[in-house]
């Protein structure tokens, strides 16, 4: 069993690591209340994928308070908002509807 002092040290390390990661992510993306494409993570759940407003092969994942990551599907795939993941391009999906 861990001693109380060891638990405090582990807690401090986890907190510092979290702060560093948050700072790095925030500096790479900047303040993110809304991007040029109009998508915002404001009042959206963290860890959920959302369709990109203009690209079939891209989606956003909200990763923090008003912070997002733009992710791209592999070649030959498109984002399906029903399953909230990348799926093979189909004759009835987003890509087909854009043509």
Swiss-Prot record:
Gene3D superfamilies: Chitin binding domain
Name listed for the protein in its UniProt record: Protein AC150
Domain of life: Viruses
Single GO molecular function: chitin binding
Record key words, sorted: Disulfide bond, Host nucleus, Virion
Domain Chitin-binding type-2: 38-96
Organism: Autographa californica nuclear polyhedrosis virus
Cellular compartments annotated: Host nucleus; Virion
Job description of the protein: Plays a role in primary oral infection of the host.
GO cellular component terms listed in the entry, alphabetical order: extracellular region; host cell nucleus; virion component
Disulfide-bonded cysteines: 73-86
């Amino acid at each position: 069993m861990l001693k109380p002092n060891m638990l405090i040290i582990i807690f401090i390390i986890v907190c510092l690591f979290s702060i560093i990661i948050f700072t790095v992510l925030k500096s790479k993306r900047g303040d993110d209340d809304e991007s040029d494409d109009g998508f915002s993570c404001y009042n959206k759940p963290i860890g959920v994928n959302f369709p990109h407003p203009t690209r079939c092969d891209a989606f956003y994942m909200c990763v923090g308070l008003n912070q997002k990551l733009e992710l791209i599907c592999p070649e030959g795939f498109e984002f399906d908002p029903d399953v909230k993941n990348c799926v093979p391009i189909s004759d009835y999906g987003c890509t087909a509807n854009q043509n």
